[in-house]
């Protein structure tokens, strides 16, 4: 690469420049999420619910690092100032997510870091989580072309956390954990922006001749949805307000929506459940009457999802 072009910035991708600016305008911080009122809500969770949410937040907290590792590997395959700038911002947002999850875990574990780390080590061996991670590791290892790497990354961003976000959002239906629900709103919206970015990367920087067939892509998405469904089927049994059938419908609808964004036809034709508790694209945005704050971004929002 030409030395000057490598080090002297000039706009080379309007799409990623726009996403970078959107990220700046929609930035939020861990200090904006108050968990003060959420502490008392822990007493309203039965033992099954409490264990489920401890598990989910421990998984999500560790997964943030996984996402950043994949970003660094992915960006190395492309050369674009604006793409690199955008993904630097995305890595920063993933770090914010990690800090918020750490705060939530401190609440669940009563600031006992030793117990938190011991629990995290234990759940890595959980059968449902191990199956999910095994599938992901296999797909990452098998992805040899840039197109395949981007598609796997797209699934990590768009499918890999959906059942967790959906399950956390059901706490709002129960009038519980306003702070946790607000954090979940912010993070799930951020992840949808990240999904859009991965789709933009696939559409604009991966040549058509490198892209797999629509049939191959559709089969990959079916695999991912099945893995995510099996995960929540195994972990969500008996948890209050967690409707696994509705989550599966939402997974299928989300997969179709992502496929459409990369110009591939739907594989399910499923509509999202009408009572979806998530507030980003594809669901109705609602503000619980009992919440102190709206789930909108605190700063001025551009292109609100």
UniProtKB/Swiss-Prot annotation:
Q: How does it sit in the membrane?
A: Single-pass membrane protein
Task: List the cofactors.
Answer: Fe cation
Q: Which residues cross the membrane?
A: 150-170
Q: Which residues form a coiled coil?
A: none
Binding residues annotated for Fe cation 1, in chain numbering: 64, 94, 97
Q: Which UniProt keywords apply?
A: DNA replication, Host membrane, Iron, Membrane, Metal-binding, Oxidoreductase, Transmembrane, Transmembrane helix
Write out the residues that bind Fe cation 2.
94, 157, 191, 194
Which HAMAP family does the entry link to?
HSV_RIR2
Name of the molecule in the record: Ribonucleoside-diphosphate reductase small subunit
Species this protein is from: Equine herpesvirus 2 (strain 86/87)
Which gene holds the coding sequence for this protein? RIR2
């Amino acid at each position: 690469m030409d030395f000057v072009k490598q080090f002297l910035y000039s706009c080379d991708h309007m799409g990623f420049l726009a996403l970078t600016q959107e990220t700046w305008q929609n930035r939020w911080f861990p200090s904006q999420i108050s968990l003060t009122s959420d502490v008392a809500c822990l007493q309203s969770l039965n033992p099954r619910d409490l264990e489920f949410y401890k598990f989910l937040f421990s998984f999500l907290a560790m997964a943030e690092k996984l996402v950043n590792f994949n970003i660094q590997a992915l960006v190395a395959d492309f050369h674009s100032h604006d793409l690199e700038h955008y993904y630097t911002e995305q890595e920063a947002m993933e770090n914010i997510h990690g800090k918020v999850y750490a705060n939530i875990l401190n609440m669940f574990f009563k600031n006992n870091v030793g117990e938190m780390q011991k629990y995290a080590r234990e759940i890595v061996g959980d059968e449902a989580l191990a199956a999910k991670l095994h599938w992901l590791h296999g797909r990452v290892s098998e992805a040899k072309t840039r197109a395949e790497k981007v598609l796997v990354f797209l699934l990590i961003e768009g499918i890999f956390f959906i059942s967790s976000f959906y399950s956390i959002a059901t706490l709002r239906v129960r009038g519980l954990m306003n702070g946790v629900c607000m954090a979940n709103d912010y993070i799930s919206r951020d992840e949808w922006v990240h999904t859009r970015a991965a789709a933009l990367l696939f559409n604009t920087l991966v040549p058509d001749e490198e892209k797999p067939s629509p049939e191959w892509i559709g089969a990959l998405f079916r695999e991912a949805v099945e893995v995510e469904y099996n995960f929540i089927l195994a972990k969500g049994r008996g948890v209050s307000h967690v409707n696994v059938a509705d989550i599966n419908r939402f997974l299928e609808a989300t997969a179709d929506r992502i496929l459409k964004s990369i110009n591939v036809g739907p594989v399910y034709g499923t509509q999202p459940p009408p009572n979806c508790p998530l507030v980003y694209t594809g669901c109705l945005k609602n503000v619980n009457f009992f919440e102190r704050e709206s789930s909108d971004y605190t700063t001025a929002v551009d292109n609100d999802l």
